[in-house]
Amino acid sequence: GRRAPSGGNTQLTHFMVITNQDVLSELVTLVQEEYGKMPITENTLPYMVNIIKMSAEGKFVFNYGAPVLIVLASKPSYANNFADVSCAMQNMMLACNELELGSCWVNQIRHLQDNERIQAKMRELGLGEDEKVYASLAIGYPDLPNGLNRREIEPKGYKVTYVD
């Protein structure tokens, strides 16, 4: 991720690598508790309905039990923050794939970053006062009988327009 391109080569992305299992467990509990408090309305996206319900039941583990979580942050005032973080995330996911590791981009901390409890925990872990979380990457060994699933996935959408 640290070799990913950044706008103007600013390299402002902050990588918080969390491997401490107690800290990961705390984050899972915090995320679960805060999602579990959310109301479900007619405007709640279907995937969020499941997350909220599972959280309320104490069954939502946002990092899928992975032993590593890399949280990427940047300055909200920096115009390319999300683009830079996205480049770093993609590079790390490709590297994980090459190393036969499973990876999953998880957004729960980003979605909850204005939550006081989540914000306090992230600050305690090293998030700067002038930073916000833009993405998190869960990394671990795939829990599959034959390791990493290497199946081809057909694109479902992504409109492409060619202009000659």
Label each region the model flagged.
Residues 32-33, 86-89, 153-155:
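Short, solvent-exposed amphipathic alpha-helical segments in soluble enzyme
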Residues 1, 70, 75-121:
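Small-aliphatic-rich amphipathic alpha-helix that forms the alpha element of a beta-alpha
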Residues 1-2, 137:
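Short alpha-helical scaffolding segments that buttress acidic/His motifs in well-ordered protein cores
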Residues 65-68, 101, 129-133:
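Short coil/turn connectors at secondary-structure junctions
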Residues 55-57, 127-164:
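C-terminal helix-cap and adjacent tail motif
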Residues 3-8:
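Glycine-rich phosphate/pyrophosphate-binding beta-alpha loops
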Residues 11, 15-84:
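Glycine/small-residue-rich phosphate/adenosyl-binding loop
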